[in-house]
């Protein structure tokens, strides 16, 4: 089976490498154009491109997929297209040239869109998974070939769930390809969406419900980290690991700090958080920050 692989970030590159290690014939890779990264704004290859070059797979990075993509398919004649976090919607006529299947990090039709892992955590879902579906003209609405479920822990972070779904996704992709063609099932159930993350999403408000605060912190841990004001400066918080109900203290107040973390009051309770990061400094425990005279009990985060 001749595979055309479309993907861009790390999540996609792991899937591509797993295909190669399992002996699949990837005839070409299409990835987004290279972009400047880091403080020096140096142009760096996408993670998928790096893997493709490692295995001597032809790489294409068209700005307009419909124009250049048609030539790629005409010349290489792939049997199937696999899409993992490519970064753009596929549209006709390119979409109609062969069957394209997408590996999506949610249980469709729930959480269609760009940020399913973060939105699952924000909403406190107890289960999520991987869906492999045939791409249609709508956003993540095509018929399903394969679904795999996993449980989501109460304090599981974005980083932890990302790794879990990454492992599940690459194995599901191999299973799908080994059994292709698979009978497709239309998507059924309640549709929900997972829009792209904005700066507003990263703002933490301790005046909200304690469960909301807990889920907000873990949804962006370890990257990019939720933001909250402390003494008129933006700090980041990570590592929420406990909640207490029915606190009646001042909102955003640091009730206590010990070696485990800081207990911070919310609307109807308090959360225990392990790490804080001040501007221009490394991430540190609250206990380290207290010993360094950067923070103390009784002080408050701005809401």
Swiss-Prot record:
One of its GO terms (cellular component) is cytosol. The keyword Transferase applies. (6S)-5,6,7,8-tetrahydrofolate binds at residues 106-109. Its EC number is 2.1.2.9. GO terms for molecular function: methionyl-tRNA formyltransferase activity. It catalyses: L-methionyl-tRNA(fMet) + (6R)-10-formyltetrahydrofolate = N-formyl-L-methionyl-tRNA(fMet) + (6S)-5,6,7,8-tetrahydrofolate + H(+). Keywords: Protein biosynthesis, Transferase. It comes from the Bacteria. It is an enzyme of class 2 (transferase). The keyword Transcription regulation does not apply. CDD domains: FMT_core_Met-tRNA-FMT_N (cd08646), Met_tRNA_FMT_C (cd08704). Belongs to the Fmt family. HAMAP family: Formyl_trans. Attaches a formyl group to the free amino group of methionyl-tRNA(fMet). The formyl group appears to play a dual role in the initiator identity of N-formylmethionyl-tRNA by promoting its recognition by IF2 and preventing the misappropriation of this tRNA by the elongation apparatus. This is Methionyl-tRNA formyltransferase. It comes from Thermosipho melanesiensis (strain DSM 12029 / CIP 104789 / BI429).
